């Protein structure tokens, strides 16, 4: 009983300190005038202010991303573009690398556990990565206001998906369709909770692959990563088991985001002063988030993430349309 109490107390203490760090960081990010009050040699904002604020804010994002079950890029792009004085191109470039870092860290382990399926990932990745390149080129060619408006609409759409989406641990797939049979997309994995061997196959392969064209374009255009869309398509439409869908989606990000990230890198839209503190903050926050996950209430965290995305999506939409944002 004592250890349980201490564990809970430790979790809430961590949440308290995270909130305490987040308040001044978000306040500073929301008001450039406040940042400008920090003295520097030339009377301008000190060079270390924004990297420090980025580190703190992304640390909080890393915690929320783990607890809310969303990718870091989904939180990073709308929040940083909405409340920080950075150009959207730089934010999208950094957002892709934030999503990519988590995918690269998780990919080898998921393949080793036989949860991520190469047979499922390769045809999907071929389509999504090619379309992500196209999406990145479109995103860089369009005016910033249009991309910002579309980003806000997309984030609000993600909120709707999170509110309405259902999950199916083991979808019922009566028989594999002709395309998945020809590509030999099937597999076996061991369910850790029961020790049973699960044979799986997929159907509705062609509609799923067509949807990944749209997902790839959106991932490249907005720098969000695409885990929020990959899992529902793989799980609910194509019928892959939930664990296989989540693991394959994570592995897919390491391919899709890499292709789009090269476009932003080639155009000079990746700034180390933004990317380095963001990656460090997200990774450290993810480590803390895993610990808090043991004692936090998932339902509360999920609603908190949805509220945060709703707020950031509305901010991005109004910013793109040039409307005043009223809290």
Where do the PLM segments sit?
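Short helix-coil transition sites and intra-membrane helix breaks within transmembrane domains
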Residues: 64-74, 219-227
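Generic transmembrane alpha-helix signature in multi-pass membrane proteins
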Residues: 77-78, 104-115, 199, 218-220, ...
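Central cavity-lining transmembrane alpha-helices of secondary-active solute carriers
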Residues: 101-107, 280, 284
């Amino acid at each position: 009983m004592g250890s349980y109490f201490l564990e809970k107390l430790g979790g809430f203490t961590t949440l308290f300190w995270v909130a305490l760090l987040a308040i001044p960081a978000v306040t500073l990010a929301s008001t450039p005038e406040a940042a400008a009050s920090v003295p520097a040699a030339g009377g301008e904002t000190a060079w270390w202010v924004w990297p420090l604020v980025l580190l703190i804010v992304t640390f909080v994002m890393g915690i929320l991303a783990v607890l809310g079950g969303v990718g870091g890029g989904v939180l990073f792009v709308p929040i940083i573009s909405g409340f920080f004085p950075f150009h959207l191109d730089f934010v999208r470039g950094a957002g892709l690398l934030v999503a990519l870092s988590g995918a690269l860290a998780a990919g080898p382990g998921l393949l080793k556990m036989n949860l991520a399926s190469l047979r499922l990932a390769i045809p999907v990745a071929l389509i999504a990565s090619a379309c992500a390149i196209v999406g990145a080129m479109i995103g860089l060619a369009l005016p910033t206001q249009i991309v910002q408006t579309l980003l806000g609409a997309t984030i609000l759409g993600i909120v709707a998906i999170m509110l309405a989406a259902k999950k199916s641990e083991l979808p019922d797939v009566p028989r594999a369709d002709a395309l998945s049979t020809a590509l030999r997309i099937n597999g076996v994995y061991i369910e850790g909770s029961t020790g049973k061997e699960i044979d799986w196959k997929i159907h509705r392969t062609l509609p799923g692959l067509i949807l990944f064209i749209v997902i790839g374009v959106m991932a490249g255009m907005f720098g969000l990563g695409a885990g929020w869309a990959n899992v529902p398509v793989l799980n609910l439409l194509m019928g892959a088991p939930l664990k296989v869908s989540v693991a394959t989606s994570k592995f897919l990000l390491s391919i899709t985001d890499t292709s789009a990230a090269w476009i932003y890198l080639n155009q000079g839209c990746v700034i180390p002063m933004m990317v380095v503190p963001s990656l460090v903050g997200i990774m450290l926050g993810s480590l803390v988030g895993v610990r808090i996950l043991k004692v936090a209430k998932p339902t509360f965290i999920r609603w908190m993430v949805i509220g945060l995305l709703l707020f950031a999506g509305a901010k991005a939409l109004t910013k793109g349309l040039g409307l005043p944002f009223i809290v």
